[in-house]
Structure formats: C-alpha cells, structure tokens
C-alpha cells in the first residue's frame, strides 16, 4: 500500500481560470526527475487521489505540481480551492519510468508535451544532470491558447542557462500567437514545419523523441514516425 504523508500548501499560482500550480512542503522520499506521485484529499469520508508529476527539480524542497481543473471532477476543483496553510495528502514514494535513465544516447533529444504534461521535462531540465550525452535538446510545449503556456518564462530561462544546447518552441492550436507555431504537433512534424522552426532534423538516426501529454498526440506522433 502507498505510504501517505501530510503536506502543507505554501503557494497557489492561478495561471488561468482552469490552470494552476500547487507548491507543497511534505516529507517525501527522494525522487527522480520525470517521476510522479499522488495527491489526495478526504472528501465525503474517503480519500480521493490522482497522480501528478513533479515540476520541481528533485533537489528543490518546494514540491510543485501543474494542474488543470476538471469542472465536474471530484478532486481537481478541491485542489484548486486550497490556500497556503491548507493540508493535502501526498504519497511519499514517487513512481514512473519517464526518466532519463530510459533514454538512449543520441545527438538530439526531442521533448514534446501538451498541456500540463510539460512538468516532467521542467523537472529534468531544472536538475540538469545526465544531459551531457545529448548534443542538442528541444523542448516543445503545445497548448490551445498562448495564455495556457504557463511556464514559458521558465522555459526561456532554461534556454538561456543551456547556452544554445536547448531550443524551445511553443505551439498553439486555437489562435495565432507571436513566437508560437499554429496547429498540432503531429501535423507540424509531418509537414516539416516544426523541424524548420527549430533548425534541427528529427530522424531515427540522430534523434530520440520523448512524448508526454494528450494520448491522441502520442498516437498521432507515433504514426507519423
């Protein structure tokens, strides 16, 4: 059984009406960048729980989670209503294999995400370990609207930190926004527009692609390959 610990909310960042980030202090066990845990609340006499990826680097005690409110959901609206000082239950041991140990050496590592699934990549890049085996890294974040690109400032900071090794590209599907490609990731790959915008090829010989997010995007991306 999962070992639950009590965490205390230290910050709530509301990005849009639907998107928010929770920062929590909790005595969790060490985790690997890219992993997830579970958050839970007691609701109507039972613990309601969902899995969420860590956004923060494993060496940062401020545990950060990026969430979307599901209007009819049982847990996410309650999490969105939390205030600093409120308690939330956290599974102490992280899980998941979306980690760099599972990624083979390659020239270019492509990290593709939709929506709140940008979190694992931000954890990996903020930690910055085991990345020397990649010559280039590309972080692509797709959302419906530019306002949904909550972590763009952090992405830009990371791009500067890696001094040319990391390239970032945002994609929006329901409007035109400066600096972003318009459309959906699979179509932009198939047309060659994503590679052109980034300035790097995506191929089986030199690239490895990590996919995180919308299941349809993952299926479509695999079919493009």
Regions found by a protein language model. Give the residues of each.
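Conserved S-adenosyl-L-methionine
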Residues: 106, 130-137
